Amino acid sequence: MKKKNISPSLVLHPLLLLLLPFFAFNSLALKFSPQLLSLLSLKTSLSGPPSAFQDWKVPVNGQNDAVWCSWSGVVCDNVTAQVISLDLSHRNLSGRIPIQIRYLSSLLYLNLSGNSLEGSFPTSIFDLTKLTTLDISRNSFDSSFPPGISKLKFLKVFNAFSNNFEGLLPSDVSRLRFLEELNFGGSYFEGEIPAAYGGLQRLKFIHLAGNVLGGKLPPRLGLLTELQHMEIGYNHFNGNIPSEFALLSNLKYFDVSNCSLSGSLPQELGNLSNLETLFLFQNGFTGEIPESYSNLKSLKLLDFSSNQLSGSIPSGFSTLKNLTWLSLISNNLSGEVPEGIGELPELTTLFLWNNNFTGVLPHKLGSNGKLETMDVSNNSFTGTIPSSLCHGNKLYKLILFSNMFEGELPKSLTRCESLWRFRSQNNRLNGTIPIGFGSLRNLTFVDLSNNRFTDQIPADFATAPVLQYLNLSTNFFHRKLPENIWKAPNLQIFSASFSNLIGEIPNYVGCKSFYRIELQGNSLNGTIPWDIGHCEKLLCLNLSQNHLNGIIPWEISTLPSIADVDLSHNLLTGTIPSDFGSSKTITTFNVSYNQLIGPIPSGSFAHLNPSFFSSNEGLCGDLVGKPCNSDRFNAGNADIDGHHKEERPKKTAGAIVWILAAAIGVGFFVLVAATRCFQKSYGNRVDGGGRNGGDIGPWKLTAFQRLNFTADDVVECLSKTDNILGMGSTGTVYKAEMPNGEIIAVKKLWGKNKENGKIRRRKSGVLAEVDVLGNVRHRNIVRLLGCCTNRDCTMLLYEYMPNGSLDDLLHGGDKTMTAAAEWTALYQIAIGVAQGICYLHHDCDPVIVHRDLKPSNILLDADFEARVADFGVAKLIQTDESMSVVAGSYGYIAPEYAYTLQVDKKSDIYSYGVILLEIITGKRSVEPEFGEGNSIVDWVRSKLKTKEDVEEVLDKSMGRSCSLIREEMKQMLRIALLCTSRSPTDRPPMRDVLLILQEAKPKRKTVGDNVIVVGDVNDVNFEDVCSVDVGHDVKCQRIGV
């Protein structure tokens, strides 16, 4: 069908009708200017916040014919009043560009970047034939890029970065003979790069990275003699780099990383004397690094990582005096590192890990005072560690593991105030570990395991202010543990296994932060200190293969999160305290090869591996196939009951007896009697406690969707599993597999026997609340599938989330993402949480207040999408009238709660702000370094109040050195500070928080296993894109932007 020609007046007619009241008194003055009507059509067609077009108003007095020339974003010609520049960038606009934009016929500059414009790209823009700059980057335009751009014959700059275009790259771009900058990066273009692009003789900048382009690289691109920046990485090309690219004599930046290229590196690239950045990583290049590359005297950044290169580092690299970044990781390179590399005056980053290098490291490495990070792990380096590595006190990451380094650690490292992460395991280092590491205020991670260190473990490790991980296992200390080791303020994981330690285990007083303690395979003796109950966060305790004696402290069973206990291969005696049978968290309890007697506790122990109790001749019970002699053990219990009828004495009772005995001077016989009494009190626990009597009635299942299992299925599954996913203030969560194979999460709310709280439930209130929660449906909310209840217990049935929680991701220490990918994922999680809370606050009737928002209540589904859990559950339980109910968790509770004892939507906003601060800083909501009584909110505000560099607050491991990520983190910091305002009235509603977050959302795209992080055409900084190899530190690679 043939298109009709439509006159401008007819096109504008509907708009005139719409605006008729507006011009009722002003029609003559404004003369219905197409300039005005085109701009007003933009205003009416695009949606955005009120501020977007706040000053785009037409006066009713008719005093200004060209009123639009004073509007924000609009620049007019001084003579004709025609619009020559229109900048609507970063206004949070959405919608589609109206056809009336074509009547801005004098427009030279049009910037629509940083919005959410969508749909096909409007061809009406191609009618703006005078345009010299067109920026549509960071929007959501989709479909194929339409033909017609060649009509913009004066165009110099075209930026379409980060959209959703697909199909082939437009070939008619090649007809833009004045074009200097071309950016089609970050979309989904496919096919080959048009060879005709090689005819753009004035082109200085081309960016096609982050698409799905394929085929061979066009040799004709070598004809772009004015080109300074070529960025075409993260595509799927094949073949080699054309030798014609050596003709790009003005090229400064060249990036073909992650492109599936192969073959040898072209010798001719060594002729690019102006080249400053050369990124060829993650390809299939083979052969040696050409010696001609030593001619690249301007080179600052060189990354050949993750290829199949062989041979050695060219000796001429020692002459690259401007080089700051050298990364050759994961190749087959060998030989020695040229000595001159250590004397490069600007070198800040050296990555050589996972090669076959030999010899010693350059002895002057770091002497330039600028070295910041070095990783030479997984090679065959020998000799000593250079003492000059931290000469400028800027080194923050030093990774040396899996080599053959020998000699002592340089004492200079103990003065390296910048050091954050130090890994030197699996070497041949010897001598004494120098004192001083404990004074390093930034040191968080130290691994010196599997070396030959001797003498004493430095006691000052216990004073290291932020140290979280310390591994000294497999060494030759032959000394006692430092008495103060458990007082380390932030130490979470401590391993000194198989290190020839002797003596007794120090008392556990002060053991507040430890998650894992590994002391197996030593020669420790004495008893296990009873005050291990101080280790409140302990998950894993391994004291196996030592010479420990005495009884097993019942205090271990009271640790709220303890999961793995290994006391095997010792000389322990007595019985296993019955308290362990009621533990809800223990999944492993290995006491094999000891001298234990008596019954194995029932309860949760019934599902443990029988081998955990082997080689204890005196143990009895079903697990070891030996029936217990009830008369023998009952007699023993009766004897104890005669002395302690009212309640079994705990450790403190035994301690009192010891004190009294010493005080009155009664000697040996009284001590024996007290000891016997104390040991018998442990035996009494075999038959005591932990049993719930009485009839609790039948189970009832209330389902909120169709379920393929029954209440009995749930109860039976829980009776057979000890797979605890978590435990909190409201109950314990189990992973349960139903008979049909479906996996769900079951939250058993605390009953009346939880500690001494004597919690009771209001039956009707519970059911009413559950009914409200069961009807919540949102993609960012964990779905409540149903509820099982009886007279004494309530269990909530949720969909199972396989990827753990945000707390695991932030603080679990298992980094499986790159820095850029992790930040992007965390930002998306933050948005997901905001969307979920926004739904609860603004779309539910009645409004649902979460009451306990924290990272452990934010779960991650199979796609790492955030799902808010435990919303409203805190209202389902209450304590006796004499007990006070604390709504929320320490560190996340809004300050006004202290005097109002009320929780509302603003309380959730505060908790959400704390979560954002945890994401930004990498720290927990409460840490010792914040000072007594202070939270992360106080700490951040104190840092900003003292005018410390805001970047010092940002998490180093999250890529804060990357300009784009750094600015995004600062933006999130501003939002977090708003949310954690002391006054509730100053906190924005979650709807506004969500809007701000979405406006500042980072533009990232994933292709395969790679995250594309590419910057704006006008941004000449660099992004760090980090990859993780199993067992390695984060490896940073860079993508120029």
Swiss-Prot record:
Record topological domains on the Cytoplasmic side: 674-1041
Protein name, entry field: Leucine-rich repeat receptor-like protein kinase TDR
Record organism: Arabidopsis thaliana
Residues engaged in binding ATP: 725-733, 747
Effect listed in the UniProt record for changing residue 210 to A: Reduced interaction with CLE41 peptide leading to desorganized vascular tissues
Key words, A-Z: ATP-binding, Cell membrane, Developmental protein, Disulfide bond, Glycoprotein, Kinase, Leucine-rich repeat, Membrane, Nucleotide-binding, Phosphoprotein, Receptor, Repeat, Serine/threonine-protein kinase, Signal, Transferase, Transmembrane, Transmembrane helix
Subunit structure: Interacts specifically with the mature peptides CLE41p and CLE44p, especially in the presence of SERK2. Interacts with LURE1.2.
Description of the deletion phenotype: Reduced procambial cells number, and adjacent or interspersed xylem and phloem formation.
InterPro entries: Kinase-like_dom_sf (IPR011009), Leu-rich_rpt (IPR001611), Leu-rich_rpt_typical-subtyp (IPR003591), LRR_dom_sf (IPR032675), LRR_N_plant-typ (IPR013210), LRR_R13L4/SHOC2-like (IPR055414), Plant_LRR-RLKs (IPR050647), Prot_kinase_dom (IPR000719)
Function: Acts with CLE41p and CLE44p peptides as a ligand-receptor pair in a signal transduction pathway involved in the regulation of procambium maintenance and polarity during vascular-tissue development. Mediates repression of tracheary element differentiation and the promotion of procambial cells formation and polar division adjacent to phloem cells in the veins.
